[in-house]
Amino acid sequence: MATINQLVRKPRKRKAKTSDVRALEACPQRRGVCTRVYTTTPKKPNSALRKVCRVRLTNGFEVSSYIGGEGHNLQEHSVVLIRGGRVKDLPGVRYHTVRGALDTSGVNDRKRGRSKYGTKRPK
């Protein structure tokens, strides 16, 4: 325990909080190229085949990114936009691909919550 005199001379330092999405480097989104597109299984107690892609970002980071929505058109060398946002039941997946941006198509036949899936308004 520090004495009051020691604290007067040198106050306590605040611990700096590190970001959960460090690869974005304080940007809202980042562009990258898919290096691998695959499915993976979630943690217990959930069961599914979650669509994930490994992305090499323009700043040199390589991260795993979740592909939301039903069906996608991504393959290796697709250019994608990623945003922050982890997937709780997939360890190590801390980013989401933005649907409807760059090479990623929007979700077909989506009627509600379209803005989150890059779908145009149906006629």
UniProtKB/Swiss-Prot annotation:
InterPro entries: NA-bd_OB-fold, Ribosomal_uS12, Ribosomal_uS12_bac. Keywords: Methylation, Ribonucleoprotein, Ribosomal protein, RNA-binding, rRNA-binding, tRNA-binding. Residues 1-22, 101-123 are annotated as: Disordered. Gene3D superfamilies: Nucleic acid-binding proteins. Residues 111-123 have a biased composition (Basic residues). GO terms for biological process: translation. It comes from Teredinibacter turnerae (strain ATCC 39867 / T7901). With S4 and S5 plays an important role in translational accuracy. Interacts with and stabilizes bases of the 16S rRNA that are involved in tRNA selection in the A site and with the mRNA backbone. Located at the interface of the 30S and 50S subunits, it traverses the body of the 30S subunit contacting proteins on the other side and probably holding the rRNA structure together. The combined cluster of proteins S8, S12 and S17 appears to hold together the shoulder and platform of the 30S subunit. The modification 3-methylthioaspartic acid is found at D89. This is Small ribosomal subunit protein uS12. GO terms for cellular component: small ribosomal subunit. NCBIfam families: rpsL_bact. Part of the 30S ribosomal subunit. Contacts proteins S8 and S17. May interact with IF1 in the 30S initiation complex. The keyword rRNA-binding applies. One of its GO terms (molecular function) is structural constituent of ribosome. CDD domains: Ribosomal_S12. Pfam families: Ribosom_S12_S23. PROSITE patterns: RIBOSOMAL_S12. Belongs to the universal ribosomal protein uS12 family.
